[in-house]
């Protein structure tokens, strides 16, 4: 199956699954077991109907197996895509956090420089504390 091959190429094949079963690698068998019974000339009675029923059920099970395998492969590929998107999002958030930290460090330095320049006067952006994250909370905030 081509989806199985795509899973392998994407590195998403589970090690516990093992190789694709031979019954799913090959096309479904052609023909009808009833034809072989009729050509042999043997009279099997109810066994023929039972064999035909078993043959049909095996065909139905094979179709369901193929459908389920296709769905499993689709889900695996979708999970791989989602995993890549998650990694990208996490990397972007990490970069944003790093930029914010650098900006905060830059603002802290600016506050120190402004405080020195104003000689004790409080600037508009600076609270007088060179490290805004370490300032005491407002009284109203603590109530």
Curated annotation (Swiss-Prot):
The lineage of its organism: Eukaryota, Metazoa, Chordata, Craniata, Vertebrata. Residues 90-106 have a biased composition (Acidic residues). It comes from Rattus norvegicus. This is Glutamate-rich protein 4. Residues 90-143 are annotated as: Disordered. Residues 107-116 have a biased composition (Basic and acidic residues). Disulfide bonds: none annotated.
